[in-house]
Amino acid sequence: MAWIEPEVTEKPKKPMFLCVLSSTKTAHIPKLSAAGKTAELTDYTPAGDAELMETGNIISVPVLPMTPPYDTPTPAIMTRSALKLTDAPYHFINSGLIVTPDVPCIDLKANPGEDIREPVAVMDVQGIYERAKLLAKRLRNQADHVVIGESIPGGTTTAMGVLMALGYNGNVSSSADENPLELKKQVVEEGMKASGLTFGCLKDDPMKAIACMGDPMMPAVAGLVAGFQDTDTSVVLAGGTQMAAVYALIKHMGLNTEKIAIATTRYVVEDKSANFIQLTTTLGVPVVYVADPGFGKSSMKGLHRYETGTIKEGAGAGGAMYLAGLFGITQDQFRTEVENVCKLLKAGH
């Protein structure tokens, strides 16, 4: 396949990349998230991702975000490479982190998400949404095209929960090669029960769907999208099933979705355990960009593992590659830069 499909033809004058960093205690459930060596270490993953994207290495976190069992390097290596190659302006947004990174972050004053099996998973959903909306209004003069990524371990499970509450059957993707779908479904069922919910019962109350079954990344991204409405700014949601869930929320909030696209990696699209394209088609997403970093041509074993589905997406990697494509970067140039980032990290061998 081509490096980015459909081909990116329109180059915006002022693109910007935003990455929302969040935590949910749902990630502490053993064997649920592979976005860290252990369930407890997932707390450090968003902070590690941000430090890596900003500096090319970790600063304050104790361990580089890796996916076991082969220590495949975090998708943030792709985002770091794209930001370096394009020199596009970017901001990190803290929306409920347990561990904060040692790099500049815009703080939305959100609490970390609780386990979705608790009656309330996200506190102050409306407040997070409004603060993110205000932030977007401040940024919109600086950008005509915004790519929004996320880093939140456990986020595919909360995505499934929100989709179910809104009335969508969404088999979500995973940060692991073996997608623990049955465990996710069990956790979501327990969460729905704890909140007294049934399938589709919150289709008219997306904010409550976030409060009961979601995570703090969701109201932040939805608020950002709301703040860029009524302008010429177009938005690309950078991610897989998590951003499909955010798109569903935005749609159910009654926001205009005509200028919202999704960009992800081919690893998400090819994930046989998920139904990503079916879901985005059902949701009516106008455009889904699919990026292929071509890691099969790499000499690094850690990057080869992406080709086998060991790791698929995160830290806005698909959207960051889409952004690189906007700037005319080729797949070979991109892959070479990723290898350089890995060499400096001593990761991916």
Swiss-Prot record:
MF term (GO), any: nicotinate-nucleotide-dimethylbenzimidazole phosphoribosyltransferase activity
Cross-referenced Gene3D superfamilies: 3.40.50.10210
CDD domains hit by this protein: DMB-PRT_CobT
Family: Belongs to the UPF0284 family.
Name of protein: UPF0284 protein MM_0708
Organism: Methanosarcina mazei (strain ATCC BAA-159 / DSM 3647 / Goe1 / Go1 / JCM 11833 / OCM 88)
